[in-house]
């Protein structure tokens, strides 16, 4: 079994201009994310997929493996799939390029089920437990929530607070979805060939395309939260946390 981490890295970004090249203690943000990914124990290879010659150049200088992908791709999963065709592999991990604080052990949580006994998962992802009284987070449409079945497979993902709390129950479980995925190679190829689904378009959540088409997404619980970078304020916070963690 050969697991490959692919990090999609577009130069254009809507909220924070060219964030992949933002400085993080002397290195571009995307280089810091790649450095963390290379510490994974289960992945045999880490590849960055980009549409930018500038990103390509800084990563090659850092020693990373980089592939160029089409600038016309509309989402990170399409970029992962195009890179997968170039590099080959059995399992492909989609790791966001703006997560320089990702714990390598967290990445391995998503990969591990593909190395276990029994049938291989279609896809795995991560969820972070929330407390029922964390209403501000649960009600936030920018925070994607997940509900799971008793085997840990996703029943649904939504920007709405799910499950809806009609009455207070002490055992109600809430999960925040963490957007790291590991795909079986054939599932990734099938996924990007499918048209956007109704629920996907309604929620603006591409993972719903898998669920609507009968694929299972196994959710692994993690207690390690990983901040991303979408605003200048979040970048400053990640810089502070990076200095604390790595002593830069």
UniProtKB/Swiss-Prot annotation:
Class of this enzyme: transferase
UniProt KW keywords: Cytoplasm, Lipopolysaccharide biosynthesis, Nucleotidyltransferase, Transferase
Transmembrane domains' residue ranges: none
A matching Pfam family: CTP_transf_3
Annotated GO biological process: CMP-keto-3-deoxy-D-manno-octulosonic acid biosynthetic process; lipopolysaccharide biosynthetic process
GO-annotated cellular components: cytosol
Pathway(s) served: Nucleotide-sugar biosynthesis; CMP-3-deoxy-D-manno-octulosonate biosynthesis; CMP-3-deoxy-D-manno-octulosonate from 3-deoxy-D-manno-octulosonate and CTP: step 1/1; Bacterial outer membrane biogenesis; lipopolysaccharide biosynthesis
GO molecular function: 3-deoxy-manno-octulosonate cytidylyltransferase activity
Family: Belongs to the KdsB family.
Name the UniProt record assigns to this protein: 3-deoxy-manno-octulosonate cytidylyltransferase
Organism per entry: Chlorobaculum tepidum (strain ATCC 49652 / DSM 12025 / NBRC 103806 / TLS)
């Amino acid at each position: 079994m050969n697991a490959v981490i692919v990090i999609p890295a577009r130069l254009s970004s809507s909220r924070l201009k060219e964030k992949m090249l933002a400085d993080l203690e002397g290195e571009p943000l995307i280089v810091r994310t790649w450095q963390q990914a290379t510490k994974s124990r289960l992945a045999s290879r880490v590849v960055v997929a980009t549409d930018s010659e500038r990103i390509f150049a800084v990563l090659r200088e850092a020693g990373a493996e980089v592939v160029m992908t089409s600038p016309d791709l509309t989402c990170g999963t399409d970029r992962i799939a195009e890179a997968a065709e170039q590099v080959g592999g059995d399992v492909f991990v989609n790791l966001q390029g703006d997560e320089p604080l990702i714990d390598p052990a967290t990445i391995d949580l998503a990969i591990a089920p593909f190395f276990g006994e029994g049938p291989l998962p279609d896809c795995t992802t991560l969820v972070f437990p929330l407390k029922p009284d964390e209403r501000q987070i649960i009600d936030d449409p920018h925070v994607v929530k997940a509900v799971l079945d008793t085997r840990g497979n996703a029943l649904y993902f939504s920007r709405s607070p799910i499950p809806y709390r009609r009455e207070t129950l002490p055992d109600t479980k809430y999960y925040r979805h963490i957007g790291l995925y590991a795909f079986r190679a054939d599932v990734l190829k099938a996924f990007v060939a499918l048209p956007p689904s109704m629920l996907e378009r309604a929620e603006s959540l591409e993972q719903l395309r898998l669920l609507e088409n009968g694929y299972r997404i196994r959710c692994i619980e993690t207690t390690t939260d990983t901040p991303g970078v979408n605003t200048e304020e979040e970048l400053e916070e990640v810089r502070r946390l990076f200095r604390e963690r790595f002593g830069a």
